[in-house]
Amino acid sequence: MRTVFIGAHEEPNGVNSYTYNLALELKKRGFESFVMSFGSCNKVTDYKGVKIKQYRTWGNTMTSIPVLYLKSLPYLIKHRKEIDMVMYQTVTFSVIPSLIVRLFGMKSSAIIHSLAEDSPKHGKMMKKLLMASMRLALAFTKNVVTVSCTKAKEVYNRYHKSCKVLPCGVFLPINKELNTDILEKNEIQVGKFFLTIGRIDPIKNYEVLIDAFKRHNHVNYQLVIGGDINNAYGRTIVERAKGCKNIIFPGIVYGDAKIALLKNCMAYCLVSSSEGLPIALLEGMSYGKIPVVTRIPSIQEVLEKYEIGLWSTVKNVEEVIANMIAIEKDFNTLKVQGKTA
């Protein structure tokens, strides 16, 4: 059986790592897997032995994914006799491409990581449009995979569509020498900073972390927010952090730079309003870091069975402040939570 995964970015991070790791697990179990990604150039490479065919696209993810889906069609049609399943990274943009591949005898499925209409950056009209497009897409998509039981319930309750659940996962870190100067370059203090890494989007509530950090005088500690701040929301949170030199924006972090931050932080923070199954949180847990999190279903699904985490309600600055202070005052006791994870 040969499965082709389509829709990953050239850097296997965040939600993209779900696609790469799924392909890798299939390969380990004796199945053929192949990834089609988008990036800055056309090339063929590999990820831990999984072949990757990369297509050059322009713009952001929202414009790159539909372009990739269309660019992949000639290859899929040409090699249709060798391909059993085509798995698309998103449902919404995959309707027409998946119909085409099915016409040529291949099976198709699509992944739901999160529901776009839940993001607070969208107004009422846009949310209605997103929900209408998702409803239409799901009507034409036979096989749907999602990343958590929580998300499967949300999709069923909202759209009456049943999904198969393939949970997110991350590889446990290995000890290796890191080739990065991210700590020195940004004057980040080892073991003295709160960390969050991810897509810079209003749904992540970074302003809550910033307000909590600024309102309590964290003189000896830092808050590090990793991600691409070159968008409207990014500019807003940078402006909000002004006047506090201990809030640091190192930009997009991959590879060794990301490992260095995860390895040396004191706690990993995720205060989102909504998540699929948060890979960023799993990465923080894999390094034994204390989770500072919001009480939302997808995070509860990950943490509550272990009875760990410092919890807050969504957008509650006071509770986040209390959690940060607790870590600073009682780090040696609370760090056991991270080790338990």
What would you call each of these model-derived segments?
Residues I290-V293:
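Short hydrophobic beta-strand element within catalytic cores of glycosyltransferases
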Residues K305-N316, I325-F331:
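Conserved acidic donor-binding segment of nucleotide-sugar-dependent glycosyltransferases
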Residues I77, L103-F104, K127-V144:
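Membrane-proximal helix-turn-helix segments that form the acceptor-binding/catalytic region
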Residues V4, E187-K204, I210-K214, V224:
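Conserved donor-binding/catalytic core segment of Leloir-type glycosyltransferases
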Residues A139-C163, V170-I174:
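A short, active-site helix/loop in glycosyltransferases that binds the activated sugar's phosphate group
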Residues Y88-S94, I112:
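Short His-centered aromatic/hydrophobic patch
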